[in-house]
């Protein structure tokens, strides 16, 4: 198994409570991720179902679907940027299983790494070979460099051979920029997809949002031109803006008004913001412009406080006159086109204007990005902000920082907030920042590598460890479960106050999936024989994992044998009692096969100390007056123990006389 870079797309996306303690549900961040699906790698089953309801097949889609039919098939899809290539590839994999009513339990639906640079530095993990029926996506569409494409082609050849041998299925999205260099030997497996009809895409999304419209409402020349020329993701954004205009209640009460506002937002906003910033020359007005864009829909007093902090962060000193002698706050807002509702909340008068303002400042004032990071650090803590509002501000900042290629700003802030969290609390701002980073299509690998480096560091604080635990459990486990296991394992064996939360999350995650269960056994076995000043956390964790309540159903005996073998190779401890007792109870009460008794005893390799302790455990488990079922199970267990002890004794082999059984010795 491997700590490799791939995306699992089988698990549902949502909050999961994996044990005792608080559950951190970041609704604002989650909702915003749902609104920005095109930028996220989180294509869980729920997300695929969402896309399937809205998907419009492009030209030649059926040809690609037919090529994917046979076990071991690899289909390469080509197409111009903006034609919806990635969405089509995801739907090919999704509908392959849907059309056949395939149960995805135990089937891998994963995104593979593009190049080796996205793997953990120094990772010694081996890639997991695919199984029959597994489905894989390899998206090479972002490659523009021929050297990088050369490496990607070598990885493609290796993946293709594995897929064919296993009878799995793979869809590859080819890069358009280097289309002249596509492998000729795969031409017969390559399909060049057309662009879906833009108007059909827009119509499908509008209908799924419950929009009341007629065909005549979509007949304008501007809209028709947009549908013919724009990338599919821009049409999806347009439909989302129509929904936002409707839901806001501020832009008319009919579809035509909502569509007009949305069209204006996607075609003219950038130029409007540029002209307005050029007209506003002084620092206070520009700072207020940006503060209102980050804190839009929040109370005016909060925006005012954030504005003042921003001017302090950029080291601007106001004029010496008192505030009563300056332009009042309301007048400044009016000049900037910012309205104040009856409840005191501030909003830009035009649809999607705040987003355009944020985009403009991050793109055109790169010298203040570090200052903006420090400003958000403290401004997101302003008194009066609700938790959802704090997270919303952080999400807006993170979106712009990621677009500007500054993932380090997100991680720096997450670490600061995590370290300042009181007691054992987990700051939701830190969780939201890291979740957004992990879900970013281009920079998600950077965050996974950074997390890997941090969990291995002895300098990791308890606060950040708690945040990383939550992020692994909530987010990374849904997209890269094997990487989540590796990181949680490092967190769980740290022997700190925060490690218990990681342990519970890790055991819960591993017990849900056979692959992950075996992966964790393999990762814990080497450390089972290494004691520390405070015991052996690897051995403790492995023993907890091997209980009957954690094992997959039905149990996979070779995996359990490897785990029990590592445990029973160490001196007996009290942890053996719940481990062995859980399996004895499972055999007696739950119909677990007796194979459990034989495999458990076999894992001792006849070690006398281990066999003796297991005998004593069974004696205590049965009790002085055992029930018939317990007495029968205990007797069969003792028989396996006696057989193991008898079989390994050299004297027995030479003389033919057996040693005393455990029962006789007792």
Model-predicted regions and their roles:
Residues 386-572:
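Extended amphipathic alpha-helical coiled-coil/heptad-repeat regions
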Residues 1-43:
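Long, low-complexity intrinsically disordered regions enriched in small/polar
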Residues 271-274, 280, 295-427, 444, ...:
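C-terminal leucine-rich, beta-strand-based interaction scaffolds used for sensing/assembly
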Residues 85-104, 267:
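P-loop NTPase Walker A phosphate-binding motif
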Residues 103-176:
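Conserved P-loop NTPase "ATPase switch" module shared by AAA+ and STAND
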Residues 72-88:
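Walker A/P-loop nucleotide-binding motif
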Residues 179-183, 203-266:
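Amphipathic alpha-helical "lid/sensor" segments that cap RecA-like P-loop NTPase cores
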Residues 37-65:
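N-terminal pre-Walker A segment at the start of P-loop NTPase domains
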């Amino acid at each position: 198994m491997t700590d490799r870079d791939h995306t699992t797309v089988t698990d549902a996306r949502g909050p999961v409570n994996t044990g005792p303690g608080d559950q951190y549900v970041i609704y604002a961040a989650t909702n915003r991720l749902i609104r920005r699906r095109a930028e996220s790698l989180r294509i869980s089953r729920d997300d695929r179902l969402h896309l399937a309801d809205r998907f419009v097949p492009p030209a030649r889609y059926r040809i690609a679907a037919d090529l994917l039919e046979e076990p071991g098939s690899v289909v390469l899809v080509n197409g111009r940027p903006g034609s919806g290539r990635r969405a089509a590839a995801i739907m090919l994999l999704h509908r392959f299983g849907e059309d056949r009513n395939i149960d995805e339990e135990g089937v891998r639906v994963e995104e593979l790494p593009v190049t080796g640079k996205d793997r953990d530095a120094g990772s010694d993990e081996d890639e997991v070979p695919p199984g029959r029926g597994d489905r894989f996506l390899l998206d090479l569409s972002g490659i523009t460099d021929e050297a990088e494409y050369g490496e990607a082609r070598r990885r493609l050849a290796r993946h293709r051979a594995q897929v064919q041998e296993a009878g799995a299925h793979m869809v590859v999205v080819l890069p358009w920029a280097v289309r002249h260099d596509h492998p000729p030997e795969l031409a017969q497996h390559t399909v060049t997809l057309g662009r879906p009809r833009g108007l059909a895409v827009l119509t499908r999304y509008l209908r799924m949002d419950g929009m009341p419209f007629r065909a005549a409402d979509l007949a304008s020349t501007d809209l028709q031109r947009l549908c013919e020329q724009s990338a599919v993701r821009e049409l999806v954004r347009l439909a989302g803006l129509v929904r936002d205009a409707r839901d806001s209640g501020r832009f008319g009460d009919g579809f035509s008004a909502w569509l007009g506002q949305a069209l204006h937002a996607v075609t003219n906003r950038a130029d409007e913001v540029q002209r307005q910033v050029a007209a506003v020359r002084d620092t206070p007005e520009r700072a207020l412009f940006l503060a209102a864009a980050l804190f839009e829909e929040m109370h005016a007093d909060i925006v005012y406080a954030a504005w003042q902090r921003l001017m302090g962060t950029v080291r601007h000193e106001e004029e010496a006159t008192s505030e009563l002698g300056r332009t009042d706050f309301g007048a400044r807002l009016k000049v900037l086109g910012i309205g104040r509702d009856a409840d005191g909340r501030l909003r830009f008068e035009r649809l999607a204007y705040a987003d355009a303002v944020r985009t403009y400042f991050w793109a055109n004032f790169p010298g203040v990005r570090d200052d903006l990071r420090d400003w958000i650090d403290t401004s997101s803590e302003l008194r009066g902000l609700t938790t959802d509002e704090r997270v919303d501000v952080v999400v807006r900042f993170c979106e712009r920082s990621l677009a500007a290629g500054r993932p380090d700003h997100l991680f720096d802030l997450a670490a600061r907030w995590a370290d300042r969290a009181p007691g054992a609390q987990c700051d939701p701002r830190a969780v939201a920042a890291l979740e957004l980073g992990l879900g970013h299509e281009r920079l998600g690998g950077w965050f996974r590598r950074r997390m890997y480096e941090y969990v291995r560091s002895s300098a990791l604080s308890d606060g950040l460890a708690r945040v990383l635990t939550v992020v692994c459990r909530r987010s990374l486990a849904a997209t890269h479960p094997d990487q989540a296991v590796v990181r949680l394992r490092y967190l769980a064996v740290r022997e700190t106050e925060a490690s218990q939360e990681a342990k519970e999350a890790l055991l819960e995650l591993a017990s849900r999936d056979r692959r992950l269960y075996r992966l964790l056994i393999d990762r814990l076995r080497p450390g089972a024989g290494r004691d520390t000043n405070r015991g052996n956390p690897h051995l403790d964790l492995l023993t907890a994992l091997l209980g009957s309540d954690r094992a997959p159903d039905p149990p996979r005996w070779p995996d359990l044998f490897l785990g029990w073998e590592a445990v029973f190779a160490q001196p007996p401890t009290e942890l053996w009692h719940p481990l062995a007792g859980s399996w004895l109870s499972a055999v007696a009460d739950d119909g677990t096969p007796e194979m459990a008794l034989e495999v458990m005893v076999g894992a001792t390799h006849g070690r006398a100390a281990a066999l003796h302790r297991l005998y004593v455990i069974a004696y205590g488990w049965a009790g002085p007056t055992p029930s018939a079922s317990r007495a029968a199970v205990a007797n069969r267990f003792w028989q396996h123990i006696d057989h193991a002890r008898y079989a390994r004794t050299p004297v027995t082999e030479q003389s033919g006389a057996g040693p005393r059984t455990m029962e006789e010795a007792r």
